Regions:
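Alpha-helical macromolecular-interaction surfaces
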Residues: 22, 91-92
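Conserved active-site tyrosine of GNAT-family acetyltransferases
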Residues: 23-28, 97, 125
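Conserved beta-strand-loop-alpha-helix junction that forms the acyl-donor binding cleft
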Residues: 17-19
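Vicinal oxygen chelate
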Residues: 1-11, 34-86, 92-121, 132-134
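Polyanion-binding surface elements
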Residues: 14
Length: 134
C-alpha cells in the first residue's frame, strides 16, 4: 500500500521552556538567529534559521494545547531531542556558546564520517549539537 497523501515537510521545531522570549533573545545574541515572530503575551517566540523555523513556547502553552503538557528538563540528563546548529567554525561557535552560559557535554571532535561536532546544553536545558555541514 502506498501513502496516498502528499509528502510532508518539516515546518518548525518547538522547544518548550519557562521563558520563550528569554530563550529567543539568547539564541539571537549567541548564535545570530533572527527573531521572526513573538506572541504579544510572551508565550511563543520564533526564530528564522534559514531552512526552517526554531520556536520556543511556554510550558503553559503546552498545557493548554493538550492534556498533560510536556516534561520539564531533567537537570542531570539532556532530553531525547537535540537542536543542531550548523557552523563552518564549530570550535569558535562552541566557545561563544560556552561564554554565553551554555554547558559543555562533549568538546568538538572529528567524526569518522568527516563532520566536526560538539554537544552543549543551553541555559534552558535544551541539548544542542554544533556541527559542520553534512
Amino acid at each position: 500500500m502506498t501513502n496516498e497523501i502528499p509528502p510532508l515537510t518539516l515546518g518548525w521545531t518547538i522547544v518548550y521552556v519557562e521563558d520563550p522570549v528569554a530563550a529567543s533573545e539568547f539564541y539571537a545574541r549567541t548564535f545570530g538567529l533572527a527573531p521572526d515572530f513573538a506572541a504579544p503575551d510572551g508565550s511563543y517566540a520564533q526564530m528564522d534559521t534559514g531552512q526552517t523555523k526554531l520556536a520556543f513556547a511556554s510550558y503553559e502553552l503546552a498545557d493548554a494545547n493538550f492534556r498533560g503538557g510536556v516534561a520539564r528538563p531533567d537537570p542531570d540528563r539532556p532530553p531525547n531531542v537535540e537542536v543542531t546548529l550548523v557552523s563552518s567554525d564549530v570550535d569558535g561557535a562552541t566557545r561563544v556558546a560556552l561564554d554565553a552560559g551554555c554547558t559543555s557535554l562533549a568538546e568538538p571532535v572529528d567524526k569518522p564520517h568527516g563532520q566536526r561536532v560538539a554537544y552543549i546544553r543551553d541555559p534552558f536545558g535544551t541539548l544542542v549539537e554544533i556541527g559542520t555541514p553534512m
